[in-house]
């Protein structure tokens, strides 16, 4: 296998190009560096930048079918073995639970024992954790450990996001116990976030499990075991997502029941008010349409007596409703 020279990986608009020093640290790539399995190169690109796109389209260091995938063609998490290398698509959780649920960032990478090429359009926050460890000298030492650390960081971010959603569901359940209904669209957004998470994290767990079972030459048995642990941890997160989705369905039914009961109470109250004032409306209408003149209009106490009669009628109807336990 021909050696890779550092000059072949120099891209002006690359996000960064680092060489792993084999001791947990990194150093910037130079033209004189020789890339091998002991000191692999990590090249991180934004595939929308012109120089990076041109390099991806023309470089002989990548297989032809890898170039299109790294340029943004693949979206769902998946892994494809290509010789001794692997083409991997992963999803990362960026931001907070207040964002729209489609804010899952795609990261695509191809790696073998000497070269790691990762691409993205939007920033992948999980990579900052790995890069920070490398700059402090506590990071991965080779390609296999790098992949494990990246997958672990992605799972940490996913688990944290799932925990935030779980806390919001608990708060929502407490509010419903106090008959407090959430704002319109709040529960729908929360449910959609969970469904989108389920859609992408389930195949991502399968990617981790596949990497744990593949006999890639640049991954050790210990690294495969760690990858299997990561897959199981993400699987537990998926179980939590399923539980949260079921709980949101129950809360949706509870909210509908609360709204129905509130509407029924209002309708009941309006019906009682109509029943109370119906006799008085009848009497006032009856007196008003008397063509021979309103009875008692010539007596100075006629209007007062009529008002008193209305009060007695309304009071009698209210007493009857109360005795019948309608009021």
UniProtKB/Swiss-Prot annotation:
It is found in: Cell inner membrane. InterPro entries: CorA_cytoplasmic_dom, CorA_TM1_TM2, MgTranspt_CorA/ZnTranspt_ZntB, Zn_transp_ZntB. One of its GO terms (molecular function) is cobalt ion binding. Its main location: membrane. The chain crosses the membrane at residues 274-294, 301-321. It holds the Pfam family CorA. The keyword Ribosomal protein does not apply. Residues 1-273, 322-327 are cytoplasmic. Keywords: Cell inner membrane, Cell membrane, Ion transport, Membrane, Transmembrane, Transmembrane helix, Transport, Zinc. It comes from the Bacteria. It is a multi-pass membrane protein. It catalyses: Zn(2+)(out) + H(+)(out) = Zn(2+)(in) + H(+)(in). GO terms for cellular component: plasma membrane. Residues 295-300 are periplasmic. Zinc transporter. Acts as a Zn(2+):proton symporter, which likely mediates zinc ion uptake. This is Zinc transport protein ZntB. It comes from Klebsiella pneumoniae (strain 342). The gene is zntB.
